[in-house]
């Protein structure tokens, strides 16, 4: 069971493959950044619909289990309804390890990368490389090629050019 307020464990969890509609939501999110390189996902339904990347051989084993797991594979995000009542896939950072990223990303130098992983925003001068094609959200890489987070670009503000939305240091700051 996860710790925190994210999931209430009341009621029955349901484990199933993603539907074609849910896969389209996942695919559309990936296409904002490049090409999805993984095709098999499962859903664990409770209060939320958590999305996990699994392979088919693992899925075949899960289908045979008498008890269904509350998680399996790699957790890559959640499908939920947003404030405008639109169903949307909200990826986490691990999701992007399944995407061949070709657009909407920024590369930061060592100091800016460190500061980003401590929750700080990024000034324009700290961006070593930017491939931005109009998406509000962009992926953030360090200069070693590691994905370190997700940010929101603000082209009108040079001091807070990229707002930190989510980073790999988040877990350690809890």
UniProtKB/Swiss-Prot annotation:
Gene Ontology MF, one: RNA binding
Alphabetical list of Pfam families matching this protein: pre-PUA_NIP7 (PF17833), UPF0113 (PF03657)
Signal peptide: none
Family: Belongs to the UPF0113 family.
Positions of transmembrane segments: none
Protein source organism: Pyrococcus horikoshii (strain ATCC 700860 / DSM 12428 / JCM 9974 / NBRC 100139 / OT-3)
Protein name: UPF0113 protein PH0281
């Amino acid at each position: 069971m996860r710790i925190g307020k994210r999931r209430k464990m009341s009621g029955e969890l349901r484990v199933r493959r993603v539907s074609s509609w849910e896969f389209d939501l996942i695919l559309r999110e990936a296409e904002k950044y490049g090409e999805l390189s993984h095709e098999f996902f499962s859903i664990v339904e409770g209060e939320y619909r958590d999305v996990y990347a699994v392979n088919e051989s693992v899925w075949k084993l899960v289908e045979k289990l008498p008890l269904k797991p509350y998680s399996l594979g790699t957790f890559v995000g959640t499908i939920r309804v947003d404030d405008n009542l639109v169903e949307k896939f909200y990826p986490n950072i691990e999701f992007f390890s399944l995407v061949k990223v070709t657009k909407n990303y920024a590369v930061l130098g060592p100091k800016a990368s460190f500061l980003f992983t401590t929750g700080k925003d990024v000034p324009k001068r700290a961006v070593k490389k930017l491939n931005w094609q109009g998406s509000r959200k962009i992926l953030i890489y360090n200069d070693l090629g590691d994905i370190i987070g997700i940010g929101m670009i603000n082209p009108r503000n040079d001091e807070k050019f990229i707002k930190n939305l989510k980073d790999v240091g988040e877990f350690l700051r809890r």
